[in-house]
């Protein structure tokens, strides 16, 4: 999806047009389409996709730019009991980093960059993952309230008991916070929400138990089919049957010693399963389809030929998918809103962007900085204090 930025005031129309053209370029620079696709798989499978919207000062040869990336939920920690992650008192993003790389980046703390303040859970890999020379780096975001009542977002980075950076210790951020928007730089896209937690559950959690029953029933049905189609015999020890010839179906003759009767060799009778068990297995499959909203009308199965009936069935079958997509669009709006706030805060230098033209294959260049979207002084109060106007934009 591409954002459309709309102004709330007439004076901001030009800035809104520029943002509508520039935001897709910034998303493209961040390979957002791949991140969006990867996170959709996470959302479908595990119920939650986590996006991080940061300012990366190392981008653009040190000029800095917006950085949008996927966050692993195993490395994200929040206050228990909150449903909205923005209401959490603290937010932690942890990562395992090689100690030698940390010493190169922070040489003043050499010898003090080992330790694990947080136990980082890991996935079960086929390969052996060595974490002996890695340390847990914690990015800690927390909110405070200024004297004027404004919510400030502060940021600290530490390893073990060694503090690497704290925005409250930096005069540039002490009074304004790390990001001016005052929000945690994390956006969660939830599949099926739950009370008391900002994350949800996905299709794996929904379909796991029905699939276990389906697998067990199918296994038993297949086992019975194999037993029924493969003949076995009770053979008396006194029966002189050439077993090699008996087991080799390519030989027309099987030699025996003595007489053969039902007392010396007898086929083992295997009773086939009733049709009811196949019906039960099919019912469980249909149940899982209903639970997962994976109906035949969504995949174009035959059976209904009237156009109006097909449209009605598809409309009814798409309710779940429409809500999933709408939730991702709402997440997309939050991500782009954070991008606008980072542009407002950090785009002091004019930058050039190539945007798509009106005709196919055409393009043009536009220049942009944050002069038109920063807070603008519009007057003074009776006490002589300046009054500021902040341009606000809506995203569609």
Predicted regions and their residues:
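Extended alpha-helical, oligomerization-prone segments that build pores/tubes and scaffolds
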Residues: 1-396
């Amino acid at each position: 999806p591409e954002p459309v930025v709309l102004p709330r005031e007439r004076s901001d129309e030009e800035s809104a047009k520029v943002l509508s053209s520039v935001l897709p370029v910034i998303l493209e620079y961040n390979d957002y389409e791949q991140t969006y696709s990867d996170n959709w798989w996470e959302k479908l499978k595990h119920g939650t996709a986590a996006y991080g919207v940061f300012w990366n000062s190392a981008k653009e040869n040190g000029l800095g730019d917006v950085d949008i990336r996927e966050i692993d939920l195993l490395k994200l920690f929040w206050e228990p009991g909150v449903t909205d992650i923005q209401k959490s008192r603290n937010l932690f993003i942890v990562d395992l980093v090689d100690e030698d790389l940390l010493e190169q980046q922070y040489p003043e703390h050499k010898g003090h960059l080992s330790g694990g303040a947080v136990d980082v859970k890991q996935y079960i890999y086929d390969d052996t993952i060595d974490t002996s020379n890695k340390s847990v780096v914690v990015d800690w975001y927390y909110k405070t309230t200024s004297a004027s009542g404004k919510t400030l977002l502060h940021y600290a980075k530490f390893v073990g008991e060694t503090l690497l950076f704290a925005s409250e210790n930096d005069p540039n951020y002490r009074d304004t916070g790390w990001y001016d928007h005052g929000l945690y730089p994390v956006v969660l896209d939830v599949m099926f929400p739950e009370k008391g937690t900002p994350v949800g559950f996905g299709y794996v959690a929904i379909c796991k138990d029905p699939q276990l029953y389906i697998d067990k029933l199918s296994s038993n049905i297949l086992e019975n089919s194999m037993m029924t189609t493969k003949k076995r015999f009770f053979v008396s020890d006194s029966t002189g049957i050439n077993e090699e010839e008996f087991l080799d179906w390519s030989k027309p003759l099987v030699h025996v010693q003595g007489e053969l009767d039902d007392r010396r060799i007898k086929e083992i009778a295997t009773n086939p399963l009733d049709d009811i068990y196949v019906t039960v297995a099919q019912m469980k499959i249909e149940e899982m389809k209903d639970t997962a909203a994976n109906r035949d009308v969504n995949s174009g199965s035959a059976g209904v030929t009237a156009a109006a009936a097909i449209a009605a069935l598809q409309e009814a079958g798409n309710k779940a998918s429409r809500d999933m997509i709408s939730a991702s669009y709402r997440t997309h709006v939050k991500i782009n809103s954070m991008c606008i706030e980072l542009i407002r805060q950090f785009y002091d230098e004019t930058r050039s962007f190539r945007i798509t033209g009106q005709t196919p294959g055409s393009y043009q260049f536009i220049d942009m900085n944050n002069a038109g979207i920063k807070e603008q002084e519009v007057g003074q109060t009776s006490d002589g204090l300046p009054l500021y106007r902040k341009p606000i934009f809506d995203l569609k």
